[in-house]
Amino acid sequence: MKTCITKGIVTVSLTAILLSCSSAWAAGKGGIGLAATRLVYSEGEEQISLGVRNTSPDVPYLIQSWVMTPDNKKSADFIITPPLFVLNPANENLLRIMYIGAPLAKDRETLFFTSVRAVPSTTKRKEGNTLKIATQSVIKLFWRPKGLAYPLGEAPAKLRCTSSADMVTVSNPTPYFITLTDLKIGGKVVKNQMISPFDKYQFSLPKGAKNSSVTYRTINDYGAETPQLNCKS
């Protein structure tokens, strides 16, 4: 799914629109697409890579990339090369991401975000105005330590659910970040939610829910949904 939030400023001489999007080769007709919807950086790897594609037939883009922490601050613990480059029409390039920070938690994943901003070349109109549309794609980056007790594929079935009069609590006893999709409580659709390792999330019982039973899917390392599961108590 591709979602965008538009932040725009219009002036007499310049229209600047900043779009913040999540995409995987999802640029459509002319634009910038990424080769993944999420990245996994396994402990011990020297670097990982992310493909960037310009699907426009005639517009070059200036590409700038960085890694952010969950509180939306740039992380100094990662280097991305090249950090700034021009991506010509109908071309691709690889971003190489290297971790250079201090050791991270050994018993669980650590979450970061990879941000890729694309600014097209300027188009001048006859009346002298300039139109610029900049896109910013942000995807999750999971740093995964060695030696976790079991692989990610076994984690979704380990979620546990408890209920009270008007609340349902989903607990994640695993060392992985788990994103719940196609989430239903009592047969009613609930907004997707990511639960951190060894954490829990409380959902209000949806109006009209038949009961407090929970069914869900999750997202794997490749951005695909896993089979549906019934949450156990």
UniProtKB/Swiss-Prot annotation:
One of its GO terms (molecular function) is protein folding chaperone. The keyword Ribosomal protein does not apply. The gene is elfD. It comes from Escherichia coli (strain K12). One of its GO terms (biological process) is chaperone-mediated protein folding. Part of the elfADCG-ycbUVF fimbrial operon, which promotes adhesion of bacteria to different abiotic surfaces. Could be required for the biogenesis of the ElfA fimbriae. Its main location: periplasm. InterPro entries: Ig-like_fold, PapD-like_sf, Periplasmic_pilus_chap, Pili_assmbl_chap_C_dom_sf, Pili_assmbl_chaperone_bac, Pili_assmbl_chaperone_C, Pili_assmbl_chaperone_CS, Pili_assmbl_chaperone_N. The operon is cryptic under classical laboratory conditions, but is functional when constitutively expressed. This is Probable fimbrial chaperone protein ElfD. GO terms for cellular component: outer membrane-bounded periplasmic space. It is found in: Periplasm. It holds the Pfam family PapD_C.
